[in-house]
Amino acid sequence: WGIDLSSYGQRQLHRRLRFMMERAGDSDLDAFLEHLARNRELSVRLKDQFTINVSEFFRDAHLFARLETMLRPRGQCHGARKIWSAGCSYGAEPYSLAIMLKEHSPHDSWQVIATDIDRQILARARQGVFTERELRNVSPTRRRRFFTNIDDEQYAISPQLERKVKFSELDLLKPRSRPPGGCD
């Protein structure tokens, strides 16, 4: 797969591997490896166990603040923009970018392309539903403008932003992987 596992501790790797072996119904490593060789879906699920999905809205606030200063003042952004969010996880980062672009580009001549290796996490990202905790860095003004409260704990991204963010699967470490073209 080309995934760098050096940041994992050995116990953590063993725990995740044992979890997948149990789910697959295999009691020993040799049986599990044979099962992996025959079952592509199991192989994908194992890979997903070893990819970490960490994200939150406006995470690394200083970077978003810098990006915001780089965006032209409201009303001056006339050209089409295409922004790529690589390793987008469950969608908080690309939607954070979309919020900023919407605020600074009133003509909607922009799109965010969001990619990740994990199919399951992309499915969640496409749903556009986030918890109160995941929105902790989103101001009340932005919450009112860009989210709909579903219940006490969940919020849905607004349709105006949802249609501006396109999610797709991409493994950045595969030699033939190509980033989306035309991105700023």
Question: What are these model-predicted stretches?
Answer:
Residues 1-84:
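Conserved AdoMet
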Residues 108-184:
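Extended basic-aromatic, gly/pro-enriched interface segments that bind polyanionic ligands
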